[in-house]
Amino acid sequence: MSIALCIVSISFLAAPHSSQAMPETPDRWFAYRSFRPASEPIGQFAELGVETVCIFPANTDCSLGVPYCASPPIWTGPGRYDFASLDAQVSLVLDANPKAKLLCLVDLNTPHWWVRLYGRQSGFEDTFYNQGKTIATPKWREDTKAYLQAFLTHMQTTYPGLVQGYVLACGGTTEWQDCSWGEESATRRAAWRAWMKERGKPDPIDIPPASVREHVTHGIFRDPQEDALAIDYWRFAHWITGDGILYFARAAQDIVKHEAALGVFYGYILELANNRLLYEGHLDFDRVYRSPDLDFFISPGTYHDRQIGGASGYMVALESLRHHGKRFLHEIDHRTHTSKSTVALGVAVPGHTNGFPDEQATIAGLRREFSLALIEGTALWWFDMFGDWFKGQAVLDAIGQMENLWEDFASESRESASEVAMIVDAESMLYVDGKAPIVREFMYNQRAGLYRMGAPFDIISMADVSDKDMMQYKLILFPNLFVVDDAKREVLRSKILRDGKTVVWVYAPGIIDGKTYDPAHVETLTGHAYGGESLTSKQMDGWTSVFAPKPNLPAPVLHDLAEKAGVHLYVDTQEPVYANGRFLSAHTLDGGDRTFRLPRKCARVTELFSGRVVAENADTFTDHLDAPATVLYRLDD
């Protein structure tokens, strides 16, 4: 296929339906998932009231070297599909729970036979680890689209109304993670050349070598002139991942026609730190979030700070998803004290060392994840990965109680209580050395301090600030706003730098204006000279500018900044706290008496896991927390 034909195929077929109205958002699922679904746990969860089950009829192996799915592959050869294997997996669920509804992952990764059959050609590689080398290959797109549409047609016609949502799964760990480090293939090179030409830029002929695409001119920063080719290439590398997602989302909707929800794992700007964020293709999320063909997004709870006593948290800019009318599903895959954490090859499941050590810790940890999902308005599934994640009557009883609380409260409209926002910028990370250790400090590690400052917060993409109401936020943190051009400067002026807000700038805010790198830009934007060692504050015209020369502000500093900004602080203990207008939750490792301050007087405050009324007609109360524990308070007027 010629270069021109290759790129026409990509650009045309990935275009969204311009006339398609935004689809309805899916339900807030409370679901069960497993790589090894079995009758007993599905039946046990059904007895708890959990009627939604996620299946993954996969064709490929996972990163631990074992198959994702114990059943035979479905995609067995060119145009050959063994739907008897798929039907058997559906039957297993329905036999265990005849009332079940399904969520279903669709494996778009290259089967082993496909790589062997076509892999002598450049660009015909295993998408699990080389997604970026193959995602622009027309043959792969066409074959995989045919499989996807045949799969969906079979499910939609054989089991009408059974599947509530499909998940398009591809790339590393089926989460659209490109592990190819930007390396070349013939089809990637063709797509890159066409992408540059479409934007009126010179034909680059080749993909820049590692010495060019990894080069930084100013410390950790690329120069917008000297390193322009590298910046363009990394922008393309993320774009092509987003383009692949949108291509298959449109292909799926040609069959599903918005009768079931459609989702992906994507947008991990908070989680993919150094050695990952620049390389793995997730920085096109602003465009993907806007797609009318996608309804929901998924990620596991963060793998940072997930231990008992940790704060947990999300990998994505959750408030931006809400802003675009999308839903989010929180994957609770946290290792419990009963988890099968070593697979057949003797390899431990990632995150095992931060697992919950005993039954009490498991219950406290699962309650933390549940409370976070309930308060943030997300869906969830309990991921019984390789089996035995949720064993023992006490653990099952705890999940059953949480299901009852979900039934009682999940349908309520969410009332935000956040007066703090962290605004993250995808574009700026294209200008940063992807391997620099400091990258971990900007967003990945910063979440821990935010969750412990004593107040709830939102995470928003800079791309959404221009058309989002920002009035509720009193304290705004910019952990990585390194590129500020004229358009961003105007957004900041009109939406952020006003109304008495306190704005915290981190490390090198605005050091690049899109055309030049100049440390003087920092002072022009913030009123503070670039550099220094300590936090400095300056009163501006209608707002307060705070400059933090070092990233990853700790909880005590954030607590003090929030207090000075007039943010309501629920606690002073530097332990994880989550809140919205109707709920307050806290998680503790050590336990003891804790005093909570409410933003208003409440007629009744009830701790929902114990059923205790802990306060009446009060705006403060003290409660005793076990060690470890998660508490969830209902705030009734």
Residue ranges with predicted function:
Residues 2-12:
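Bacterial N-terminal signal peptides
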Residues 22-51, 234, 420, 427:
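An acidic-aromatic substrate-binding cleft motif
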Residues 28-32, 53-55, 102-106, 164-168, ...:
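Hydrophobic faces of well-ordered beta-strands that scaffold small-molecule active sites
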Residues 34-46, 151-154, 275-289, 362-370, ...:
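Short, acidic/polar
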Residues 39-127, 152-154, 247-255:
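Aromatic-lined substrate-binding rim segments of carbohydrate-active enzymes
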Residues 50-84, 269-283, 292-299, 303-305, ...:
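Aromatic-lined carbohydrate-binding/catalytic grooves of carbohydrate-active enzymes
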Residues 107, 115-303, 311, 317:
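Polysaccharide-binding and catalytic clefts of secreted carbohydrate-active enzymes
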Residues 258, 291, 295-637:
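Carbohydrate-binding surfaces of carbohydrate-active enzymes
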